[in-house]
Design a protein with these regions (language model features):
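Glycine-rich flavin
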Residues: 35-43, 48-116
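N- or domain-start disorder-to-order transition segments that initiate the globular core
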Residues: 3, 7, 11, 17-20, ...
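Active-site-proximal polar cores
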Residues: 31
Length: 116
């Protein structure tokens, strides 16, 4: 499966599961997501689930979004929390002008691994 193109965010989260578990001790010890895992999370577009399509997001339906957060939490609750918080920030995008959306949510504001 190509983690960047799978239409199912739960499958993308599951695909990252082993990497998340391996990083869990480091995350707990350093209180940071390792850069390689953070890049994979960005590449998987899990931070863009609730971002409207017009702003470059996936506009994921709520039940599927919750199932994806639950899948991430099975591997590490702090990863699920980070993805949840990032997506909560996306909710304002529907109320912003396109230029503002681009300034906030486009590359490299979020991560260089994310395509516009």
């Amino acid at each position: 499966m190509d983690i960047q193109t799978s239409p199912d965010p739960v499958a993308r989260a599951r695909e990252l599961g082993a990497e998340i578990v391996v990083a869990a001790d480091e995350i707990e010890r350093t209180r940071r997501i390792p850069e390689a895992l953070l890049e994979r999370l960005h590449a998987s577009r899990l931070f863009r689930m609730l971002l409207p399509r017009a702003a470059g997001g996936d506009e994921t339906e709520p039940a599927l979004y919750v199932a994806t957060i639950e899948e991430l939490a099975r591997h590490d609750a702090s990863i699920a929390w980070n993805v949840f918080v990032a997506n909560s920030s996306c909710l304002i995008a529907a109320y912003l002008e396109p230029a503002t959306n681009h300034a906030v949510f486009a590359d490299p504001a979020w991560n260089s691994a994310v395509d516009d």
